[in-house]
Curated annotation (Swiss-Prot):
One of its GO terms (molecular function) is proton-transporting ATP synthase activity, rotational mechanism. It comes from Hyphomonas neptunium (strain ATCC 15444). F-type ATPases have 2 components, F(1) - the catalytic core - and F(0) - the membrane proton channel. F(1) has five subunits: alpha(3), beta(3), gamma(1), delta(1), epsilon(1). F(0) has three main subunits: a(1), b(2) and c(10-14). The alpha and beta chains form an alternating ring which encloses part of the gamma chain. F(1) is attached to F(0) by a central stalk formed by the gamma and epsilon chains, while a peripheral stalk is formed by the delta and b chains. Its main location: membrane. F(1)F(0) ATP synthase produces ATP from ADP in the presence of a proton or sodium gradient. F-type ATPases consist of two structural domains, F(1) containing the extramembraneous catalytic core and F(0) containing the membrane proton channel, linked together by a central stalk and a peripheral stalk. During catalysis, ATP synthesis in the catalytic domain of F(1) is coupled via a rotary mechanism of the central stalk subunits to proton translocation. This is ATP synthase subunit b. It comes from the Bacteria. Pfam families: ATP-synt_B. It is found in: Cell inner membrane. It is a single-pass membrane protein. Keywords: ATP synthesis, Cell inner membrane, Cell membrane, CF(0), Hydrogen ion transport, Ion transport, Membrane, Transmembrane, Transmembrane helix, Transport.
Amino acid sequence: MKKTTSLLIAALAVAPLAHAAEGGFVGGLMYAATDPVTFVAFLCMVTFLLIAARMGAFKTILGGLDTRASNIRKELEEAASLREQAAEALALAERRAQDADKEAEAIIDQAKRDAKAMLEEARRDLAEKISRREAQAAARITRAETEATSEVRRAAADAATAAARRILSEQTSVDQFEAAARDIERALS
């Protein structure tokens, strides 16, 4: 009933304006409510509205508006739900990004530790190789010294033997010379 009353009031306000637009109130001497044309138009409109109200036209219109309002309300609720889901998805994505950053940092740290370990191992291997090569070089030097000493001794022995043969051959007989040469060779060898 309240809605019907508000519609009637709206009709009363609009009717004089419509009549004035058509050229009513000639000279402005007459008030709109006392004009018979306006009054008849107003009665026709009120009658039409009452018949429409009895037939349920306003219920249909209001039902459609209520349906539209409920649909809009559902869409708003759905939009709010979608917004919450989007916020949750964003939070999840941010957490995953943070986890990925932490994992990347952990991988980088592990790679640095592995690189340090590999560097230390390479240094140890290099030091071991250098030590082995130094030992091999020292062994070669010792062998070379031993061989050189042996060659010098042989050369000295050969020279001493040759000198002794010369001296003995000049001073002794052949048998004594041969025996002395054998003794010298045995002693030097």
